[in-house]
């Protein structure tokens, strides 16, 4: 497992924390993925389509032998398994998994753009990511973002709490 990737996770339908835990556990259960770091969980106001419930957001670091496109397929599979529907752009969702960084690669295809194109504009992505990624920590502190609507919901307590949760 020679690739390191960072994934943002979000949920704003139903038991949001359970969906986040299940998503992290499903990532970790994949034979080609090991979750190595988890951020705290943040409660955030919706962005884009604002007529919806607040989100819980977090980020994870993984080690993987998957290539970026295989990882994208896995994240979409997990979203579908957890009941994600795509009816409204930026609308409510049970689970949202976005690949933020993959090694230090720049990828720009129709399917996948890495680094994630809007991550530096969104504190709900930067705050959890900066906790677990030194590469982003310095950039996050100087980024111009609206800090209102982003607050720590649950402090991190380690990977084990997430990867051993019931699915």
UniProtKB/Swiss-Prot annotation:
Q: Which Gene3D superfamilies match?
A: 7,8-Dihydro-6-hydroxymethylpterin-pyrophosphokinase HPPK (3.30.70.560)
Return the EC number: 2.7.6.3
Identify the CDD domains for this entry.
HPPK
Cite the InterPro entries for this sequence: Hppk, Hppk_sf
* Keyword annotations from UniProtKB, A to Z: ATP-binding, Folate biosynthesis, Kinase, Nucleotide-binding, Transferase
Keyword Lyase applies = no
The reaction(s) catalysed by this protein are: 6-hydroxymethyl-7,8-dihydropterin + ATP = (7,8-dihydropterin-6-yl)methyl diphosphate + AMP + H(+)
According to the UniProt entry, its GO molecular function terms are: 2-amino-4-hydroxy-6-hydroxymethyldihydropteridine diphosphokinase activity; ATP binding; kinase activity
A GO BP entry is: tetrahydrofolate biosynthetic process
* Pathway participation: Cofactor biosynthesis; tetrahydrofolate biosynthesis; 2-amino-4-hydroxy-6-hydroxymethyl-7,8-dihydropteridine diphosphate from 7,8-dihydroneopterin triphosphate: step 4/4
> Which family does the similarity line name?
Belongs to the HPPK family.
Physiological role: Catalyzes the transfer of pyrophosphate from adenosine triphosphate (ATP) to 6-hydroxymethyl-7,8-dihydropterin, an enzymatic step in folate biosynthesis pathway.
Protein name, per record: 2-amino-4-hydroxy-6-hydroxymethyldihydropteridine pyrophosphokinase
Species whose genome carries this gene: Bacillus subtilis (strain 168)
The protein's gene is named folK
């Amino acid at each position: 497992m020679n690739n390191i990737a960072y994934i943002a996770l979000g949920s704003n339908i139903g038991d949001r924390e359970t969906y986040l835990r299940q998503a992290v556990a499903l990532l970790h259960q994949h034979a080609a993925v090991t979750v190595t770091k988890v951020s705290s969980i943040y409660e955030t106001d919706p962005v884009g389509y604002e007529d919806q419930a607040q989100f819980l957001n977090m980020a994870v670091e993984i080690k993987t032998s998957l290539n970026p496109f295989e990882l994208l397929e896995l994240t979409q599979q997990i979203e579908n398994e957890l009941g994600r529907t795509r009816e409204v752009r930026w609308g409510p969702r049970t689970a949202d998994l976005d690949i933020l960084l993959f090694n230090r690669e720049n990828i720009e295809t129709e399917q996948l753009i890495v680094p994630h194109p809007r991550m530096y504009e969104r504190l709900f992505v930067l705050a959890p990511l900066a906790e677990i990624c030194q590469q982003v920590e310095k950039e996050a502190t100087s980024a111009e973002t609206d800090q209102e609507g982003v607050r720590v919901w649950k402090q991190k307590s380690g990977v084990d709490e997430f990867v051993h949760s019931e699915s």
